Every structure is written in C-alpha cells, then in structure tokens.
C-alpha cells in the first residue's frame, strides 16, 4: 500500500540522515548524495507503480459498482413486469369466475324454465286428453265435432239440435290463454250466457258439464 511505501521512505531518509551526520570527508558526502538520489528515484518509481495500481483498482471498483447498478435495474424491471403479469392473471381469473357464475345462473334459469314448460305441456296434454275423451263421447251422443283452427284454437261444432234441420251447425271456439285458462269466443249463433259458462268451467274444470250447458243453450235458441 502507499502508506507502507511512505513509511519505508521515512526509514530510508532517517538512515541517510544518520549517515550524513557521522560523515566528515567530501568523498563520502558525494557518495551519500548519490545514494540519496538513487533512493529517491527508486522510491518515485515504486510510488508511481503503486499509484497506477491504486487507480486501476479504483476503476475496477467503479466498473463493478456500475455493473451492480445495471443488474439491480434489470432485476427491478423484471420484478415490475412480473407483478404486472400477476395482476393481469388475477384480473383474468376474477373475470373467469364472474363469467362462470353467470353461466351457472343461466343454466339454472334455463333448467327452471324448462321444468316450467315441461309441467305446462304435461298439463296441456292432460287437458287435451280429457277434451278428446269428452269429444269422443259427445260426438256419438250429441253430434259434436271438434276441429283445430287458426291461432291454436279448437272449434266445437254441434249438430242434431234443430229437429227441422239436423245438419245445421251450432258452434263456438275455445283456446287456452296466457294464464292457461279456458277462453271461449266466436259462438254462432250468439249465446248470452257464454261468459258465465266460461267462468264456471275455469272454476270447476268440469268440461263435460260445460259442453252440456252450451248445447242446452244452443237448443234453447231453436225453440225461443
């Protein structure tokens, strides 16, 4: 180190000074002077080498610091990018969870509606079955014919009511409304009590009695 060289130089100066004080002749003085110059020159050369080594060490240290700084910067950038990626993944995960929940809700709603429709279809099929049974019964006994017409309506046609004209038709239309209740319309000839008959069949669900009452009402129009 430079401090060691300076200490060595101080030691050389002290030795030279001690020799100088004990020297009397001019020849010896000249020899000491040359020795002193050589010592100074050698020390200067060693000091120069040491200083260059110290400068090189400082440069290497600074370069090492710069490398560490660059590495730290790269590490921080990678860390920031990783945190950003993690945040994006979490966001996508939350979106996926919301989407999955929405899909599940839609599936459950579809299942409920499907069940409701299935139940309604079964109820309608049962009603139509009862209607067909009643129709078959009344077709033979009361001359009743049932036709399916526009708008999902059924048309009921009675014959054998007018003794003077047995083939003369007496008819009305029937369908199920949005509330799945019977709704009667388009009677020919017009019946005043049709609305009352409709209300009764909605309450009792006795369709056979409904048809019998309508036929009686049509028969009454013939004799009135």
From Swiss-Prot:
Keywords, alphabetical: Cell cycle, Cell division, Centromere, Chromosome, Coiled coil, Kinetochore, Mitosis, Nucleus, Phosphoprotein
Recorded coiled-coil stretches: 61-142
Region listing for Interaction with the N-terminus of SPBC24, in residue ranges: 1-144
Pfam families: Spindle_Spc25 (PF08234)
One GO biological process term: cell division
Protein's UniProt keywords contain Transcription: no
Region of interest (Interaction with the C-terminus of SPBC24), residue spans: 145-224
Location within or outside the cell: Nucleus; Chromosome, Centromere, Kinetochore
Modified residues (Phosphoserine): 12
A GO CC term attached to the entry: Ndc80 complex
Keyword Coiled coil on entry: yes
Cited InterPro entries: Spc25 (IPR045143), Spc25_C (IPR013255)
Region span, Interaction with the NDC80-NUF2 subcomplex: 1-56
Similarity remark: Belongs to the SPC25 family.
PANTHER family xrefs: KINETOCHORE PROTEIN SPC25, KINETOCHORE PROTEIN SPC25-RELATED
Functional description taken from the UniProt entry: Acts as a component of the essential kinetochore-associated NDC80 complex, which is required for chromosome segregation and spindle checkpoint activity. Required for kinetochore integrity and the organization of stable microtubule binding sites in the outer plate of the kinetochore. The NDC80 complex synergistically enhances the affinity of the SKA1 complex for microtubules and may allow the NDC80 complex to track depolymerizing microtubules.
Subunit structure: Component of the NDC80 complex, which consists of NDC80/HEC1, CDCA1, SPBC24 and SPBC25. The NDC80 complex is formed by two subcomplexes composed of NDC80/HEC1-CDCA1 and SPBC24-SPBC25. Each subcomplex is formed by parallel interactions through the coiled-coil domains of individual subunits. Formation of a tetrameric complex is mediated by interactions between the C-terminal regions of both subunits of the NDC80/HEC1-CDCA1 subcomplex and the N-terminal regions of both subunits of the SPBC24-SPBC25 complex.
Protein name: Kinetochore protein Spc25
Species for this entry: Homo sapiens
């Amino acid at each position: 180190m430079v401090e060691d060289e300076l200490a060595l130089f101080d030691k050389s100066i002290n030795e030279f000074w001690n020799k100088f004080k004990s020297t009397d002749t001019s020849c010896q003085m000249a020899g000491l002077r040359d020795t002193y110059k050589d010592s100074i020159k050698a020390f200067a050369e060693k000091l120069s080498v040491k200083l260059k080594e110290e400068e090189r060490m400082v440069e290497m240290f600074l370069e090492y610091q710069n490398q560490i700084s660059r590495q730290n910067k790269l590490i921080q950038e990678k860390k920031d990018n990783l945190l950003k990626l993690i945040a994006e993944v979490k966001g996508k995960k939350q979106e996926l969870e919301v989407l999955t929940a929405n899909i599940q809700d839609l599936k459950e709603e579809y299942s409920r509606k499907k069940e409701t429709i299935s139940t309604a279809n079964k109820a309608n099929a049962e009603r139509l079955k009862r209607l067909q049974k009643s129709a078959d019964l009344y077709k033979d006994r009361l001359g009743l014919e049932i036709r399916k017409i526009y708008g999902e309506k059924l048309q009921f046609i009675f014959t054998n009511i007018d003794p003077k004209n047995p083939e003369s038709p007496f008819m009305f239309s029937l369908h199920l409304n949005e509330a799945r209740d019977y709704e009667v319309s388009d009677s020919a000839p017009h019946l005043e009590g049709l609305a009352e008959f409709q209300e009764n069949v909605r309450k009792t669900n006795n369709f056979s009695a409904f048809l019998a009452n309508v036929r009686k009402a049509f028969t009454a129009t013939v004799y009135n």
